[in-house]
UniProtKB/Swiss-Prot annotation:
Binds 3 Mg(2+) ions per subunit. Geranylgeranyl pyrophosphate synthase; part of the gene cluster that mediates the biosynthesis of paspalitrems, indole-diterpene (IDT) mycotoxins that are potent tremorgens in mammals. The geranylgeranyl diphosphate (GGPP) synthase idtG is proposed to catalyze the first step in IDT biosynthesis via catalysis of a series of iterative condensations of isopentenyl diphosphate (IPP) with dimethylallyl diphosphate (DMAPP), geranyl diphosphate (GPP), and farnesyl diphosphate (FPP), to form GGPP. It comes from the Eukaryota. Belongs to the FPP/GGPP synthase family. PROSITE patterns: POLYPRENYL_SYNTHASE_1, POLYPRENYL_SYNTHASE_2. The record marks Y120 as: Important for determining product chain length. Mg(2+) 3 binds at D212. This is Geranylgeranyl pyrophosphate synthase idtG. Signal peptide: none annotated.
Length: 334
């Protein structure tokens, strides 16, 4: 029988959907339709500092998971992290990511969203390589947390509602902590250890986000990679912004600047000066120092229980996040 002129010669089904080429970085790409992953591949070509991968390796010093499982978990986290950045940049109307134009300015919004969504399912597909029967439930749980946190942050921005510090911390535990926790929970599921490392992971996630908020408004490195004070242009209620607004509840200047979503350099410089005048950057640095000290205490307790020397890699990550140790310009951006 002659092939139908309106039907393709290839079969698209479960087997066809899993045939993938492997990129030079070891991550799956779609063989037949590279356009599907083009926005994702574009973002990967300008890699970040990959702190999540470093954390996975560091925690595995305690958990001793086989290397093939670690590689799979790191692949899952990389796919999800980059997918979330593609979506974040659209939602925030960002202009730069890692020093280059954002993906949707090259490939368009629709194609970028589709590529990000595809990455979620490519990551989900990798779960089959893990031994833990609860891996899918863990994956779903933390992706729900991630979207819950992201949703609250978007709600505050769109409604011009300044959250409390407690609300902010809860959001960070969900949004930033989600992928941190996912990596370690998947590792724990492949390990013989029954010790819970999630409390330390939660501390690190909060430390990372508050430090990121601070750097966005204070770091020359961040300005180069993401634009000057991008959080102000986004109208984002970051940690120093929340403290500054609540330090002077009767003064609406900063709240109104956020409302404008201004790209004006002078306006953003004024906002930074205002935030500094309320002592909010100093307060932020104090919080970062406090979280770093608490993380070091948690790590010391783990080493005491599990054996000295196992925390060396984690301690190196902490030095990177500790602004006193690394210097405030150190770049750990996404």
């Amino acid at each position: 029988m002659a092939p139908s002129p309106i039907m393709p010669r290839y079969h698209v089904g479960p087997m066809a959907s899993t045939r993938r080429a492997i990129s030079k970085k070891g991550f799956p790409r779609t063989r037949s339709f590279p356009v599907l992953t083009a926005p994702l591949d574009y973002l990967r070509d300008s890699p970040g500092k990959d702190i999540r991968s470093g954390l996975t390796d560091a925690f595995n010093e305690f958990l001793c998971v086989p290397e093939d499982k670690v590689v799979t978990i790191k692949r899952i986290i990389d796919l999800l992290h980059n997918a979330s950045l593609l979506i974040d940049d659209i939602q925030d109307d960002s202009k730069l990511r890692r020093g280059v134009p954002v993906a949707h300015s090259i490939f368009g919004i629709a194609q970028t969203i589709n590529s990000a969504n595809l990455a979620y399912f490519l990551a989900q597909q990798e779960l089959k390589k893990l031994s833990n029967p609860d891996a899918f439930a863990i994956y779903t749980d933390e992706l729900i947390n991630l979207h819950r946190g992201q949703g609250m942050e978007l709600h505050w921005r769109e409604s011009l509602h300044c959250p409390t510090e407690e609300e902010y911390m809860r959001m960070v535990q969900n949004k930033t902590g989600g992928l941190f926790r996912l990596a370690i929970r998947l590792l724990q599921g492949e390990s013989r250890s029954d010790r819970d490392y999630v409390p330390l992971v939660d501390t690190l996630g909060t430390l990372f986000q508050i430090r990121d908020d601070y750097q966005n408004l204070q770091s020359d490195v961040y300005s180069k990679n993401k634009g000057f004070c991008e959080d102000i242009s986004e109208g984002k209620f970051s940690y120093p912004v929340i403290h500054s607004i609540r330090a002077r509840p009767g003064d609406l200047r900063l709240l109104n600047i956020l409302k404008q979503r201004s790209e004006d350099l002078m306006v953003k410089q004024y906002a930074v000066s205002y935030i500094n005048s309320t002592g909010s950057f100093e307060f932020c640095r104090g919080k970062i120092d406090c979280l770093a000290q608490w993380a070091n205490l948690q790590l010391a307790a783990l080493e005491e229980a599990e054996g000295a020397g196992r925390g060396d890699k984690l301690r190196a990550v902490l030095r990177l996040l500790d602004m006193k140790a690394s210097g405030k310009q150190a770049d750990v951006a996404s």
